[in-house]
Amino acid sequence: MKLNLQAPINQLGYGVAGINILKALQVNDVEVSFFPIGQPQVTNQTDADAVRKGLETAQMFDPQAPCVKIWHQNQMAERIGSGKFIGFPIFELDTFSDLEKHHLDSCDELMVCSKWAKGIVDKVGLDVATHVVPLGVDAELFPPAPARQDDKTIFFNCG
């Protein structure tokens, strides 16, 4: 499968999602043409290699391939190619401005991180097929902890 991917690569929320999704697609043999939003900021060689590979593939991108854009809901106008355009906004609010609705409505489909987010898209009346695609956890960075054997809940507040 071929895919055009637009996303930032940095240490902020969208950027962390962008690099992890890029690497996951590449590991699963998707031919990803990567079009960065902003200057990629990588922190290790593995990430640099993934970005380099995506940029090299983008030189001869398939204009008919689907395009996924991981970015803000008010900036969905720009896309790569003429294939299906799938917006992947990550948001926390329960309403959208008219500008945001207009940009989201311009997408062929949407991907959102939770059932809650899909409910918001449905509630505001957007006529766009919306798919729930939860983000994952990097088990190498955050290894699973053993489950507690008692019924206590511990909260830790730092800062």
Regions found by a protein language model. Give the residues of each.
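Conserved donor-binding/catalytic core segment of Leloir-type glycosyltransferases
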Residues: 3, 149-159
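Acidic anion/phosphate-binding donor-loop and adjacent secondary structure
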Residues: 98-99, 136-152
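N-terminal pre-catalytic "stem/leader" segment of glycosyltransferase-like enzymes
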Residues: 1-66
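Short hydrophobic "strand-cap" motifs at the C-terminus of beta-strands
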Residues: 6, 88, 113, 133, ...
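Extended catalytic core of nucleotide-activated donor transferases of GT-like folds
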Residues: 41-122
